[in-house]
């Protein structure tokens, strides 16, 4: 390829050389084995999905999708997430499979970086979907397996932020906020701009503004009780029976969130658990518990997940569900993944012994060894520098005199 783009890559895409791929494969295998021990079975879905279904149900902004046309002229997209395609799979190919379904995956997802944005357009995700188990046990299982995954990767100082996607909308409904007020508050929370949220709550003022401000910060039992009392008082004063019921639902969800975190903390005392009632996820299909997992040195979440009880219904199979996705390369940026040594036996290909050299290579590979074929030219220089080792037994120069090299050594870019 000629021209200015001969060695360039599209915005958001990058090459993965052998050293990185070896680490990606090792950590992926570790995670998939962990998931298998918890009963999850691996699946795969197409990289291309119809925009009218997956593209719409994923609730990812159209500007962030890669649109294409298939051979019949239908609009398709590179999958922007894995949860929606697996929901389609569970409602179609696996429709007759009894629930619950425990499914795992390791696949890339694609989201188009916007102008001026930095980041990857192709991200490798490794994750699970638990379909057919409701809140409570299902939510705790998702948190347990996600925490186990961070620990298995060696993530330093793992921590989780856990919220409930229904809490903020319920609080807004109980307080009977105006549409403009809701929009300003929701936008601030989506951007994690808590100063803007506080300012918007301050403009509303009074007891309503104070109740909104109580959403911010880590949730403790005392704060949950205070928020519940505040909502009860405001809704009763309004005389709106529906608002009173909504306030009661908020209290129940706050209590369930704290109970869930208490169980998680008891199971993983070395993991930090933080309840955040103002956690607003960026995917609209979440209906309940949502969470993010971090580690020391990670500037962004290593794992994201949550409950999506209505997504499968859009494909015709009603079922509660939850799951999470780990960001493989983001995790590798902060952990060491030691690779087992893999010594290689060098086999020289000399003039007149080509067939014998490959016979020797096949024999050693069949015996479980790793080989490296070295072609020696007439000038005495081999394709690997001619210095991998002297000829050994075999009389035809098949063996490199015990010369062994380990993958991932000096110069391998790690």
Give names to the regions the model predicted.
Residues 1-84, 140, 161:
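TRNA-binding/sensing appendages of the translation machinery
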Residues 2, 20-38, 49-50, 83-96, ...:
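Positively charged, Gly/Ser-enriched RNA/tRNA-binding surfaces
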Residues 45-63, 163-173, 279-287, 381-382:
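Beta-rich nucleic-acid/ligand-interaction surfaces
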Residues 64-72, 177-199:
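Acidic, His- and aromatic-enriched active-site or binding-groove loops in soluble protein domains
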Residues 67-81, 187, 394-395, 399-401, ...:
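Short, basic, helix/turn surface patches
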Residues 134, 138, 161-162, 171, ...:
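Cap/lid and interdomain-hinge subdomains that line or gate substrate/regulatory clefts
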Residues 145-152, 167-176:
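Hydrophobic mid-domain F-helix/FG-region of cytochrome P450s
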Residues 157-168, 185-186, 274-280:
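Short, surface-exposed recognition loops or helix-turn segments adjacent to catalytic cores
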């Amino acid at each position: 390829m000629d021209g200015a783009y001969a060695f360039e890559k599209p915005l958001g895409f990058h090459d993965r050389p052998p050293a990185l791929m070896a680490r990606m494969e090792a950590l992926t295998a570790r995670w998939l084995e962990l998931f298998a021990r918890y009963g999850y079975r691996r699946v795969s879905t197409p990289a291309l999905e119809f925009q009218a279904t997956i593209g719409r149900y994923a609730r990812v902004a159209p500007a962030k999708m890669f649109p294409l046309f298939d051979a019949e002229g239908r609009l398709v997209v590179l999958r922007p997430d894995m949860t929606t395609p697996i929901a389609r799979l569970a409602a179609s190919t696996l429709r007759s499979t009894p629930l619950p379904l425990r499914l795992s995956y390791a696949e890339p997802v694609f989201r188009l970086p916007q102008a001026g944005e930095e980041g990857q357009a192709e991200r490798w995700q490794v994750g699970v979907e638990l379909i057919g188990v409701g809140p409570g046990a299902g939510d705790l299982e998702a948190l347990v397996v996600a925490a186990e995954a961070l620990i298995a990767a060696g993530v330093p100082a793992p921590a989780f932020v856990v919220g409930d996607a229904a809490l903020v909308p319920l609080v807004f409904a109980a307080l009977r906020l105006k549409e403009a007020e809701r929009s300003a508050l929701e936008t601030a929370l989506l951007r994690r701009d808590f100063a803007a949220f506080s300012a918007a709550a301050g403009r509303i003022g009074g007891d309503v503004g104070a109740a909104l401000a109580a959403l911010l910060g880590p949730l403790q039992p005392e704060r949950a009780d205070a928020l519940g009392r505040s909502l009860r008082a405001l809704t009763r004063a309004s005389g709106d029976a529906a608002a009173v019921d909504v306030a009661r639902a908020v209290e129940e969800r706050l209590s369930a969130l704290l109970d869930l975190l208490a169980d998680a903390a008891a199971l993983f005392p070395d993991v930090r658990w933080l309840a955040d009632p103002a956690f607003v996820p960026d995917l609209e299909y979440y209906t309940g518990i949502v969470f993010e997992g971090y580690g020391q040195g990670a500037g962004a979440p290593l794992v994201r997940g949550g409950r999506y009880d209505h997504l499968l219904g859009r494909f015709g199979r009603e079922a509660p569900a939850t799951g999470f996705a780990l960001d493989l390369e983001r995790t590798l940026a902060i952990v060491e993944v030691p690779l087992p040594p893999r010594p290689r036996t060098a086999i020289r290909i000399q003039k007149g012994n080509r067939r014998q050299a490959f016979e020797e290579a096949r024999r050693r590979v069949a015996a479980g060894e790793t080989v490296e074929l070295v072609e020696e030219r007439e000038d005495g220089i081999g394709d690997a520098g001619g210095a991998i080792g002297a000829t050994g037994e075999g009389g035809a120069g098949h063996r490199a005199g015990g010369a062994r090299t380990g993958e991932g050594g000096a110069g391998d870019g790690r």
